[in-house]
């Protein structure tokens, strides 16, 4: 499979772009464990062209994590084009357009999945971004706005005609948000459409490499993208069996990388999300107070001390 000039091996599994999750530390760890491609947190086009510092920082990438994509979102055509030009200068391998984020603060303003209610503008943005940059442009979207508007089959053809190099489909509508089950049947139908020649990447309800393999076998997609199941679990991209202590080592490393590459305050905030979600602490009796302490820690030393206490108790 290829996206532009970027080649992948068989059955590639990607890390999805996620706000406050796919910072550089987490991306580097996911890459180490086998993620075929990683994406930055999504980037607001409006904030980018206004030169907002925290947004500009999201463009920082490392050669170690390649291939890497930067995803942008917005509702204004000119802003999306200008943002894409800025992103191109950051040197990613791919620019991805987010037409799938369902959260109210994004979709409610007409961006992300909100574009599913304005297909002409979605196509205009896509066409103009493709024309404005030399990097491969890809799109991530959903099946439609709701179950009365399952438009993905036609939309995939329209986006392909705009010149995108790959399409990621999350198997839910915007109205579903993250409830119910992802419908991979429609993703498979898009892949089997004889008019479609770009890679189709499936996304939704993938919790392991075994489930990714089933998606490849059943629906014939070119790649699988994993999102929420990666929280606190960068080793999900590997079949390697890790001990509790090894997993704790990895989470401590994530903390150190984030503090070093971002700053202590925000690095801790980013790492807390993974500590709150990681499966390694689930089911541990009498763990509530320890969890609260982890999520309240304000310095790296305090958080490392708490994790060492956990290691002593459980490792």
Give each language-model segment a name.
Residues 116:
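Aromatic- and acidic-residue-enriched carbohydrate-binding clefts of CAZyme catalytic domains
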Residues 13-17, 38-40, 68-72, 95, ...:
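Hydrophobic faces of well-ordered beta-strands that scaffold small-molecule active sites
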Residues 1-9, 19, 24-25, 124, ...:
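Alpha/beta catalytic cores of nucleotide-metabolism and tRNA/nucleoside-modifying enzymes
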Residues 47, 104, 233:
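Short glycine-rich, flexible loops that bind phosphorylated cofactors or substrates
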Residues 18-20, 43-45, 73-75, 100-102, ...:
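Active-site beta-loop-alpha junctions enriched in small/polar residues
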Residues 81-111, 120-198:
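Alpha/beta enzyme core
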Residues 2-4, 9, 18-93:
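Glycine-rich, positively charged N-terminal anion/phosphate-binding segment
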